[in-house]
UniProtKB/Swiss-Prot annotation:
GO terms for biological process: translation. This is Large ribosomal subunit protein bL32c. It comes from Oltmannsiellopsis viridis. Residues 1-23 are annotated as: Disordered. Signal peptide: none annotated. GO terms for molecular function: structural constituent of ribosome. One of its GO terms (cellular component) is chloroplast.
Length: 49
């Protein structure tokens, strides 16, 4: 096998930052969903008591 050409640092950094942005967006969404679920659970508890 012949070694592949090296990608430039800037391209690597672009891919990394893009990946990090996507991960950050997903984390924020997951947190929002979790907060919503907890809030709805708490209101359901309050109405049953």
């Amino acid at each position: 096998m012949t070694p592949k050409k090296r990608k430039s640092k800037s391209k690597k950094n672009l891919r990394k930052t893009n990946w990090k942005k996507k991960a950050s967006k997903q984390a924020i969404k997951a947190l929002a969903v979790a907060k919503h679920v907890l809030a709805s659970y708490n209101t359901a508890e309050a109405t049953t008591n």
